[in-house]
Amino acid sequence: AEWKERIEQKLGAMPEVFALHDSDFGRTDKVKHQIMLSDQTPFKHRPRPIRPQDLDAVRRHLQELSEAGVIQESESPFSSPIVVVRKKNGDVRLCIDYRKLNLQTIKDAYALPNLEETFSALTGSKWFSVLDLKSGYYQIEVEEADKPKTAFVCPLGFWEFNRMPQGITNAPSTFQRLMEKCMGDINLKEVFVFLDDLIIFSETFEEHETRLL
């Protein structure tokens, strides 16, 4: 269709907004994630064993994250264990067990939007586009002084995050606050933001094309 070709052509003229490869995470300079503790006492967990059949995949994943600048080697007094989960496609996902860190973290009062109430903003709209940020959390840097608190240990090394990891208290609040700040006055008027998902909505196609591009 003509409109589809026109939109694809316009999107092709702005390659900087798209990830070029799996490790192309991008980075924002508008915020850094802070981890404020009510109890500053460091803690250390022993590394949990990794199944032999998962070792190579975990090693590759750690190397990819390190090369992308998401993690770096650590000498932190804090240490959380990892849990290795296999995705449906066979890739590994590293889940850090941050329960101890989260217990010591002062909770951010910034609330996520109520989905039922927010969806009412979409009433009357007929055109929708959904955008998903590529590894959204990894686009936010961790405050330098707080990086050691994110440290995790496994049989393949001791690492800490340069970018905001999943599983830590307040990460959703940090992300939602950033997204709403970036959208400014168009939030809930032209776009609905929930963490790393954006829904652009409008009543007519002409209006939608303008909002999308």
What feature does the model see in each segment?
Residues 1-213:
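Retroelement reverse transcriptase polymerase core
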